[in-house]
């Protein structure tokens, strides 16, 4: 299983850029295999992300902002959920990883 991080490479928001970087750095530091999916380059990727976020997890207004995190095609959560799981030391549960995560080749 591969963690998929949906991000925006050309975001003008400093906050979004920092949040994306924090998620990727955590995955890299913990050798958790992941794939970056840039939603700014392909409309179909953005639409797939929007469609696969459960309705009860969508923001009250507007579109979901990156980063959005999936385990293959299963939605894990957004940055706030990731941050909460990191603070409570439950990231593997958040990412729905049961065993030692696959190591990314360096």
From Swiss-Prot:
User: Which UniProt key words apply to this protein?
Assistant: Nucleus, SH3-binding
Q: Where is this motif: SH3-binding?
A: 61-67
The Swiss-Prot or TrEMBL record annotates one GO molecular function as: SH3 domain binding
Q: Which GO terms describe its cellular component?
A: cytoplasm; nucleus
Q: Which Pfam families match?
A: SH3BGR
Q: Which domain of life is it from?
A: Eukaryota
Subcellular localization, per the record?
Nucleus
InterPro entries per the UniProt record, alphabetical: Glut_rich_SH3-bd (IPR006993), SH3BGR (IPR051033), Thioredoxin-like_sf (IPR036249)
| Principal location listed in the UniProt entry | nucleus
Which PANTHER family does the record cross-reference, listed alphabetically?
SH3 DOMAIN-BINDING GLUTAMIC ACID-RICH-LIKE PROTEIN, SH3 DOMAIN-BINDING GLUTAMIC ACID-RICH-LIKE PROTEIN 2
Q: Name the protein family.
A: Belongs to the SH3BGR family.
Q: What protein am I looking at?
A: SH3 domain-binding glutamic acid-rich-like protein 2-B
Species of origin reads Xenopus laevis (African clawed frog)
